[in-house]
């Protein structure tokens, strides 16, 4: 199998495309800060960085609500999202119209088998994570094999598309411990001039290079500039295990845009107002007694007096310090209520047709799909074309 990389290693090719991704990566992190900070943290190293919790939870609720609605529509539980049919005209042309019922029965058997495979897999759990990345960052990469569905966030892959939006090239970056690599490959690495024994004690970067050639995708993996043996792969484009998704499509751009990005202004305003209200309320809750230094009542007398005690003094010498900002707080609360209502509408957190139940009917699934389509201006249609159809074809191919 031949790969044309113009003399570049997969690592070099990855680094050359990272710059084109930087803008989208930065926007994704900004959106994650005010929704679910742990989803796309500032640091992508192996150590867990300290994450700052937002003062409001509307953003997180919105992302989870919208992701859940997409999940229930794209992969509804105990409900097939597809129906296999055969072209009746083709049967008539071949004079086999009498086999229609028998063929339909066979197709129902295939449908049930596919649906059962989906139910027992981890696909729904992985897809929910992927949908949250789509809502926040607008981009996610899925890898579907018989072992399950793997999710690559935006920080772990780069890609190129043509003007129409077809995927031309994908590179992923992962880390792996050297002991997980083939022993003969490790021996090959040790023979290199730039071999560092200390570095080989830590996790190593592995790059996967996926490239489209005509109607096929081919791929291989690389580590330390060397191709890893037995990592070659090939598949037809329509049944590829690599499913690259975007939320909001922009013509001519390799990456999509996140839904949160469109409402980030409201979320930032809500965050600032909630911080002011919370900090102001904490200051208002603090009780301080002021004592007239020229009066007959002494501060020490009050400080040492237990509850219900009788002490000598004058009430006029004592006052309670008040912030006096209740009017300002009420204005902020009104603005918070207005913004919250707008965001709840935008993220479909208002009353919906979906019941709080483990199973939903086909009618409810159709109503949710219609709600998503009407509210999100065709974004649901993009996901049906870029996820449901490739996912189903890949599942049938497996």
Feature-to-residue mapping (PLM):
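A broad, structural surface signal
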Residues: 108, 112-123, 132-136, 212-217, ...
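Structured, contiguous alpha/beta core segments that scaffold functional sites
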Residues: 12, 136, 144-305
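Extended, helix-rich architectural segments
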Residues: 1-190
């Amino acid at each position: 199998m031949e790969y044309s990389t113009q003399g570049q290693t997969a690592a070099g090719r990855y680094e050359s495309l990272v710059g084109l991704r930087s803008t989208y990566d930065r926007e994704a992190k900004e959106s994650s800060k005010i929704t679910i900070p742990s989803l796309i943290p500032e640091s992508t190293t192996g150590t867990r960085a300290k994450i700052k919790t937002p003062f409001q939870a509307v953003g997180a609720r919105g992302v989870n609500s919208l992701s859940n609605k997409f999940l229930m529509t794209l992969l509804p539980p105990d409900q097939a999202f597809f129906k296999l049919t055969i072209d009746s005209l083709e049967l008539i042309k071949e004079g086999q119209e009498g086999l229609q019922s028998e063929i339909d029965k066979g197709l129902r058997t295939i449908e049930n088998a596919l649906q059962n495979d989906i139910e027992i897999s981890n696909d729904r759990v992985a897809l929910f994570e992927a949908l949250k990345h789509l809502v926040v960052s607008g981009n996610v990469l899925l890898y579907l094999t018989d072992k399950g569905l793997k999710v690559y966030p935006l920080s772990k892959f780069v890609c190129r598309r043509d003007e129409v939006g077809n995927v031309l090239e994908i590179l992923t970056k992962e880390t792996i411990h050297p002991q997980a690599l083939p022993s003969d490959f490790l021996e090959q690495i040790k023979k290199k001039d730039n071999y560092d024994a200390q570095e080989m004690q830590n996790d190593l970067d592995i790059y996967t290079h996926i490239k489209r050639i005509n109607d096929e995708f081919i791929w291989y993996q690389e580590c330390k500039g060397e191709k890893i043996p037995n990592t070659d792969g090939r598949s037809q484009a329509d049944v590829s295990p690599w499913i690259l998704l975007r939320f909001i499509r922009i013509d001519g751009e390799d990456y999509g845009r996140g839904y949160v990005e469109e409402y980030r202004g409201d979320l930032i305003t809500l965050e600032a107002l909630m911080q002011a209200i919370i900090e102001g309320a904490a200051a208002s809750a603090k009780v301080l007694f002021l004592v007239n230094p020229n009066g007959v009542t002494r501060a020490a007398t009050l400080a040492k007096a237990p509850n219900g005690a009788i002490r000598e003094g004058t009430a006029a010498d004592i006052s309670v310090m008040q912030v006096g900002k209740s009017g300002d707080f009420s204005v902020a609360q009104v603005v918070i209520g207005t913004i919250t209502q707008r965001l709840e509408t935008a993220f479909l957190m208002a009353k919906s047709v979906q019941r709080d139940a483990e199973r939903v009917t086909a009618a409810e699934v159709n109503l949710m799909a219609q709600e998503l389509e009407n509210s999100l201006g065709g974004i649901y249609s993009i996901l049906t074309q870029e996820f449901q159809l490739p996912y189903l074809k890949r599942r049938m191919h497996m």
